[in-house]
Swiss-Prot record:
Residues 58-230 form the Phosphatase tensin-type domain. It catalyses: a 1,2-diacyl-sn-glycero-3-phospho-(1D-myo-inositol-3,4,5-trisphosphate) + H2O = a 1,2-diacyl-sn-glycero-3-phospho-(1D-myo-inositol-4,5-bisphosphate) + phosphate; O-phospho-L-seryl-[protein] + H2O = L-seryl-[protein] + phosphate; O-phospho-L-threonyl-[protein] + H2O = L-threonyl-[protein] + phosphate; O-phospho-L-tyrosyl-[protein] + H2O = L-tyrosyl-[protein] + phosphate. Residues 692-704 have a biased composition (Low complexity). Interacts (via C-terminus) with vab-1 (via kinase domain); the interaction is independent of vab-1 kinase activity. Interacts with arr-1 and mpz-1; the interaction may inhibit daf-18. Interacts (via C-terminus) with daf-2 (via kinase domain). Acts as a dual-specificity protein phosphatase, dephosphorylating tyrosine-, serine- and threonine-phosphorylated proteins. Also acts as a lipid phosphatase, removing the phosphate in the D3 position of the inositol ring from phosphatidylinositol 3,4,5-trisphosphate. By dephosphorylating PtdIns(3,4,5)P3 antagonizes PtdIns(3,4,5)P3 production by age-1/PI3K and thus, negatively regulates daf-2-mediated processes including dauer formation, longevity, fat metabolism, chemotaxis towards salt, thermotolerance and axon guidance. Its main location: other. The active site is at C169 (phosphocysteine intermediate). This is Phosphatidylinositol 3,4,5-trisphosphate 3-phosphatase and dual-specificity protein phosphatase daf-18.
């Protein structure tokens, strides 16, 4: 054992923590510990090395302790790894880190998040408040770890206003920045994820180089999209078709010699032959390049269909049709150079990480992902958070308070104040936590840093600076057309409707972004396809690939476990564990009372959302299921998903709802699931409906909404009023007056005009099924029947399909009359046909109106506000007309009949009918008053007005229509 130098304290961090006592006679405004930290001569020498290693990362000094550390907010700290041994000579020492946190925040007020996978230390060094996340360096963060990190951090911060968190990885910049940015997204610190990234980068580093790796930024944007869609992460399985490279780089020898590797996690799945272009051919290739881009904002799904080509000139690396490759979850694509002496280095030109869940809109329940750096460039002289020409609407400037003098300072820049800052911590609480102990609240230092760096001009849009200007075409000559196979080119790559194309320009490629030798027009196209679950052979092959990647990853993790100090090895999971708790070795470990990591997550987090989901107990998938609050709005994707390109359903084979006699998950053969899906599609085909959306329990009739039983994991536990966030109203939805329940004050009921977020009384809209509504409102009342976004979508799509067919005259009238048991009476048929003609005339008048351009610019608004609105108005008229006819006795069901058949009271249905009739009635009156030429009274019969008091059993029974 080496004896430390005499001037280095030989005491442990834990003993120093016990010796560190707050001054019992401290007065307000005085520090907790009156004596500053004593630095030995050796520590002063070490400080020179530490400062050099930290380089451009910001440092913080307090009572003679100078650390690689930055306050991102008053309560969130990014800090370097608390090292021991040799590493402590050039990184933060564990002793100084513990002293720093205790002196500034007191004992028991700091929770440390360790993101350096495989590195553990005694949790008692930090009051037993440590959580470890297994994150690999130089890899994108695991999406499944972002949500549990944010939940644990928020639980800790909400427990006490004095609580803070300290987050570190190795350097305290990359992985630390990703997770802190995810947390800021989680608490709605700024509305845009790019604002959050810029904010973090400016504060954490001196040169605005915080989270710079494009793949890390992409995964932050992934997490923002998950939050936006209110989804938990669950990977999607896809087939890899090929990889295309535009403008291959010049390599050693003057030509271009590159190879491509595709990996799933750490497993290489596709390694084709290299592409070799001679020097002369590469010179001819470069001569065809124009300094233009022929697609706006590079390339996305809409532009694929518009132009009809993935690329006009690209080199291909195609997967052989007889040897398909399948990927799931995190995928890495490397582009490497081959040539002289490259065997002594990796020869990497660039690489890309992406996740398959975001490759198909079906993986996001209809959402669409785009790289935010591309869609939100800086405008004019402004940055994402800096304004030089005044604040924009709904923005407030950050206060310009000099942290040293307390006076206001001058700056030509205005910084957007984070909208979520005051909810995160109020200014009064910040003053109490810091000023009361003789410290300056970090928010004032942060404001000064943000203004100064904007003044220095170091806040730049590096990503969009490498975009090519718009032009008519990108190449003087297109590639050759024909059969595209193997490796070669250049080819003109046609776009195929069933293929998903992910395009990564040079500014979205890791390492390539920093290379000035690469052409700004270089792109990497990755072509994927959703797995057709009707092809049993394909399904079996895809299972092999998925199991292989999981096996290799598990082997790697277990090998790392054998090299770990036995003191830190995790204990086996408890019997009966579900979800991530049964994943071994665990990816998240919580400190326990013995200073080790055998603890549990916060007691406020529960497993209700996957308690009855069998996929959560499988070794391959359990790692994605973490506990969350019972009031959380995030849900896991359902078993069946829908691909909008191939217009087919696909499913997670492991996500079965069946169990054997022992209660264990039971999995059928692929043929069983294929038949199950074919049955769904056959039922839809029999009804004449296009297969337009996800379904979980068969199909409904045209224009009707079928109630479905939701699984236990999808049921919503109503939140208390204190936990409810503000209700959101999409921009394309108008507010209609309605009589009855006040959606904003659910306890009040009156006959005054209230506002309901609905469209002509048609309730299956996402915002009506948002848990932000009070459980007593009609929104949550309807949620009892439509539990998930997918069920909402299929209801909307079926109704819209019915309307489209009615307007197009495709013989749906007979199907409509048959489904609703309407007698084939000529007068009734004439009436419905006449209503369709009236609606067509209304559309013609609409096109001539002044607002037509505005309406046409928003197709979604046309569909929702006019098509569905008018259709359901007509549907209401048909109900009233047929109710008055004695020729239709089978069209009605009495309340007694419904109770007898279902065994349930019809109060819920009464409320549904009440909401429909009231909304339809009010909308008709509103439209008739505002636009009488479109709604003549003689052509639109008035629907009887119902109120809750006058809604008797008799007229209620008349309103129930099959």
């Amino acid at each position: 054992m080496v004896t430390p130098p005499p001037d280095v304290p030989s005491t442990s961090t834990r003993s120093m923590a016990r010796d560190l006592q707050e001054n019992p006679n401290r007065q307000p405004g005085e520090p907790r510990v009156s004596e500053p930290y004593h630095n030995s001569i050796v520590e002063r020498i070490r400080h020179i090395f530490r400062t050099a290693v930290s380089s451009n990362r910001c440092r913080t000094e307090y009572q003679n302790i100078d650390l690689d550390c930055a306050y991102i907010t008053d309560r969130i700290i990014a800090i370097g790894y608390p090292a021991t041994g040799i590493e402590a000579n050039f990184r933060n020492s564990k002793v100084q880190t513990q002293q720093f946190l205790t002196r500034r925040h007191g004992k028991g007020n700091v929770k440390v998040f360790n993101l350096r996978g495989g590195y553990y230390y005694d949790a008692d060094n930090f009051d037993g408040n440590v959580i470890c996340f297994d994150m690999t360096d130089h890899h994108p963060p695991s999406l499944e770890l972002m949500a549990p990190f944010c939940r644990e951090a928020k639980e800790w911060l909400e427990a006490d206003d004095k609580h803070v968190i300290a987050v570190h990885c190795k350097a305290g910049k990359g992985r630390t920045g990703v997770m802190i940015c995810a947390l800021l997204i989680y608490i709605n610190f700024y509305p845009s994820p790019r604002q959050i990234l810029d904010y973090y980068s400016i504060i954490r580093t001196k040169n605005n180089k915080g989270v710079t790796i494009p793949s890390q930024r992409r995964y932050i944007y992934y997490y923002h999209k998950l939050r936006e869609r209110e989804l938990n992460y669950l990977p999607l399985r896809m087939q890899l078709i090929g990889v295309y490279v535009e403008r291959p780089p010049k390599t050693w020898g003057g030509g271009s010699k590159i190879k491509v590797e595709v990996g799933n996690g750490s497993t290489i799945l596709f390694k084709p032959d290299p592409l070799i272009i001679s020097k002369s051919n590469h010179q001819r290739e470069r001569a065809t390049w124009l300094n233009n881009c022929d697609t706006p904002n590079e390339f996305d799904t809409g532009e694929q269909k518009y132009h009809g080509f993935v690329s006009k000139r690209a080199y291909c690396f195609m997967v052989p049709e007889d040897a398909p490759v399948f990927v799931e979850g995190d995928v890495r694509i490397d582009i490497r150079e081959i040539g002289f002496l490259k065997k002594f280095s990796d020869g990497k030109i660039g690489h890309v990480w992406f996740n398959t869940m975001f490759a198909c809109d079906g993986g996001l329940n209809g959402g669409h992902f785009e790289y935010v750096d591309k869609t939100q460039p800086y405008i004019g002289d402004d940055t994402s958070i800096g304004r030089k020409n005044g604040m924009r609407r709904n923005e407030t400037p950050m206060r310009k308070i000099d942290p040293e003098t307390g006076n206001e300072f001058e700056s030509p820049w205005q910084i957007v104040n984070p909208p979520g800052l005051e909810k995160h911590i109020t200014e009064e609480q910040a003053m109490e936590n810091y000023t009361n102990y003789g410290m300056i609240p970090p928010r004032y230092t942060i404001s000064k840093i943000l203004h100064e760096k904007h003044e220095k001009g170091i806040v730049k849009d590096d990503y969009n600076d490498r975009k090519l200007p718009m032009g008519d075409k990108s190449y003087t000559e297109s590639g050759k057309s024909g059969d595209i196979r193997g490796v070669g080119g250049p080819f003109e790559i046609p776009y195929k409707a069933e293929e998903h194309v992910l395009t990564f320009p040079v500014y979205e490629m890791d390492r390539a972004l920093k290379s000035k030798d690469l052409n700004n027009g270089m792109k990497l196209h990755v072509v994927l396809r959703c797995v057709d679950t009707r092809d049993s052979k394909m399904m079996e092959k895809s299972e092999v690939f998925g199991n292989l990647a999981f096996h290799n990853e598990s082997t790697r993790r277990l090998q790392a476990l054998t090299q770990m100090n036995p003191k830190w090895r995790p204990e086996p999971c408890a019997f009966g564990s579900k979800g991530a708790e049964m994943h071994y070795p665990p990816s998240v470990r919580y400190s326990s009372n013995d200073g080790k990591y055998n603890g549990a997550c916060s007691e406020n987090l529960v497993s209700d959302f996957f308690e009855h989901r069998n996929i959560a107990v499988l070794n391959r998938y359990c790692r994605y299921f973490y506990k969350q609050r019972s009031t959380s709005r995030s849900r896991y994707p359902r078993k069946f998903r829908y691909c909008p390109l191939i217009k087919k359903h696909f499913y997670i084979p492991a996500d079965t709802d069946d169990v054997d006699e022992n209660g264990q998950p039971f999995f059928h053969s692929p043929e069983h699931y294929i038949k199950e899906q074919e049955k769904i599609d056959a039922e839809k085909a029999a009804k004449g409906i296009e297969n337009t959306g996800p379904s979980t329990s068969g199909s409904s009739a045209p224009g009707t909404i079928k109630k479905t039983e939701a699984s236990q994991s999808d049921k919503v536990k109503p939140a208390t009023e204190d936990e409810l966030p503000p209700a959101r109203l999409p921009d394309n939805v108008r507010r209609f007056p309605v009589v009855g329940v006040d959606f904003e004050n659910p306890e009040e009921e009156s006959c005054e005009h209230k506002t309901v977020e609905s469209i002509a009384g048609f309730e299956p809209l996402e915002h009506l099924f948002h848990e932000s509504y009070h459980p007593n409102t009609a929104g949550n009342m309807l949620r009892q029947d439509y539990h998930t976004d997918s069920e909402v979508k299929i209801a909307e799509q079926e109704a819209k399909a019915f309307v489209d067919q009615l307007l197009n005259g495709q013989g749906v009238l007979q199907e409509f009359m048959k489904q609703f048991k309407v007698p084939s009476d000529n007068s009734f048929a004439d009436y419905v046909t006449g209503q369709a003609e009236v609606f067509k005339a209304q559309i013609a008048l609409l096109e001539q109106s002044e607002d037509f351009q505005r309406v046409q610019a928003n197709a979604e608004e046309v569909d929702l506000e006019h098509t569905l609105g008018e259709a359901f108005e007509r549907f209401g008229h048909v109900v009233e007309e047929s109710n008055g006819s004695s020729k239709n006795p089978k069209a009605l069901k009495t309340r007694e009949q419904m109770v007898k058949e279902t065994g349930k009271d019809t109060q819920k249905t009464r409320n549904h009918v009440l909401l429909h009739l009231e909304a339809n009635h009010r909308v008709q009156i509103e439209r008739r008053e505002t636009c009488p030429e479109l709604h003549p009274e003689d052509k639109i019969p008035r629907i009887a007005h119902f109120s809750e008091n006058s809604f008797s059993d008799s007229n209620f029974d008349q309103a129930i229509y099959l």
